[in-house]
Amino acid sequence: MNNLKRFTESIFSCIALSTLLFLGGCQTLPPADDLTPITVSHPDQAKAWELQGKLAIKTPEDKLSANLYWRHSEERDELTLTTMLGTTVLTLEATPNSAHLHIDGKDFKDNNAQDLLERVSGWSIPLADLPLWITGQIGSQDRVLSRDSKANPKQLINDQTPPSWVVEFLSWQLQSGAHIPHQLKLERGDLQLKLQINQWQALGKATIMIGEKP
């Protein structure tokens, strides 16, 4: 039994497959730190952000859908997957030099978040590139294959590590003052990921005026 199948069955022990396939609703966000919501004109102005949405993973043998919460900054990433009933099935906390994964009631650690997630869950998810793609930005290893009528990337390919990732930007939206993707589809071989971003909030450092109490 492969890792994805074993992990999928673990999730299904919390909730039936039929209810996992179509997910909605909200989740409680973690407490705020020293970052505060800001408005930006372009996503590259946001050095940190948080999002809520949905993630679907599909292979020839298995498929999984979950609610996604992701809080990203240059120093730290916090990623959580939950069922539609709010049950947490995976949490990943990562810094540039360390990663901690809690999954199926167990804890795992590694120096690299992407390697750790693939080793434990079997998911080959491009965590290093996703922050750019989620915000509609192009990395140095990406080749844009087509653009839409507004010059937004429509399809790109990243072949830094074969097999290549092919990314399709299916729709766009305005969030926090910036245009970002609403739906994306990523394919690499027989692995398919679908992302839907329902809420995206740009974050910045809170500032305290002179004479103002913190």
From Swiss-Prot:
Pfam families: LolB. Keywords: Cell outer membrane, Chaperone, Lipoprotein, Membrane, Palmitate, Protein transport, Signal, Transport. A lipid is attached at residue 26 (S-diacylglycerol cysteine). It is a lipid-anchor. Plays a critical role in the incorporation of lipoproteins in the outer membrane after they are released by the LolA protein. This is Outer-membrane lipoprotein LolB. Coiled coil: none annotated. SUPFAM superfamilies: Prokaryotic lipoproteins and lipoprotein localization factors. Belongs to the LolB family. The gene is lolB. A lipid is attached at residue 26 (N-palmitoyl cysteine). Its main location: membrane.
